Amino acid sequence: MKKPVVIGLVIAAIVAVIAGGTWWYQSRQDDGLTLYGNVDIRTVNISFRVGGRLASLNVDEGDTIKAGQVLGELDHAPYENALMQAKAGVSVAQAQYDLMLAGYRDEEIAQAAAAVRQAQAAYDYAQNFYNRQQGLWKSRTISANDLENARSSRDQAQATLKSAQDKLSQYRTGNREQDIAQAKASLEQAKAQLAQAQLDLQDTTLIAPANGTLLTRAVEPGSMLNAGSTVLTLSLTRPVWVRAYVDERNLSQTQPGRDILLYTDGRPDKPYHGKIGFVSPTAEFTPKTVETPDLRTDLVYRLRIIVTDADDALRQGMPVTVKFNDEARHE
């Protein structure tokens, strides 16, 4: 009876060892995932928002750039002239608007009333003359042409009187609301043109948008540039990413936010630290540029890993070994 018991215990021990070994192997596999990727540093094409002649560039390729640094300037003269013209336009529009609001002075109203009296007298004379000419024409003393001339003079005097009366009425009642609104709109338009002229002048100075290293200097002083033409290319200091790819079998290990260790050939014993920032929802074939021992025909998912302790030693395209293990979680 003892022999079967011993055999049973041995079998149970063997099963336990196999199960434990399987669990240990799988856990080590989960914690020991290794991927291969490349450093991915963003670049910015820097340009002027306005066009003109390039007057100066203050930086060269390889220079370290600080955010807010003046990189270059366009010729200011055309934009300074446009600014002066815009300021004058605002002054004219403001004066016209103020005049509309103020209405007319007593002296102007008196002059308009005098003009009405003068026009009235001229009309009365023309009307009386026309009446006399009508009587003479009936008695065949004058020609029809003379009568027509008298009628034309009367009509012209009447039109002059109507114009003078309308002007006097406007002076007494003040400007119409529509005219005041139009003057105000013209003033606002002039102010907008002034603001645009100020912005254009400001944009003749090229300012660095972020910290980085200057990669390329595309043009030289004296060049005529269109708005938006690339002048400089800047490699941003931050953020630094690593782009890697994972197959579907290991996709469950790449949750966003997971800590990662990143090894480079230059410092194999001192890893960088990172966190998974993005996992592509779409599978793709492994790009040819990726260094991986797996088959390149496999469908994989792209990862973007944020390097949390990046330094200047990490350069665009540098190969990186990506380690998923417990060390990354505790360091």
Swiss-Prot record:
Keyword Signal: yes
Subcellular location, principal: periplasm
Pfam families per UniProt: HlyD_D23
Location(s), subcellular: Periplasm
Source superkingdom: Bacteria
Endpoints of the signal sequence: 1-19
GO cellular component: periplasmic space
Keywords: Coiled coil, Periplasm, Signal
Residue runs in coiled coils: 140-209
Entry's family note: Belongs to the UPF0194 family.
NCBIfam families found in the cross-reference section: PRK03598.1
Full protein name: UPF0194 membrane protein YbhG
Organism per entry: Salmonella typhi
Highest classification ranks of the organism: Bacteria, Pseudomonadati, Pseudomonadota, Gammaproteobacteria, Enterobacterales
Gene: ybhG
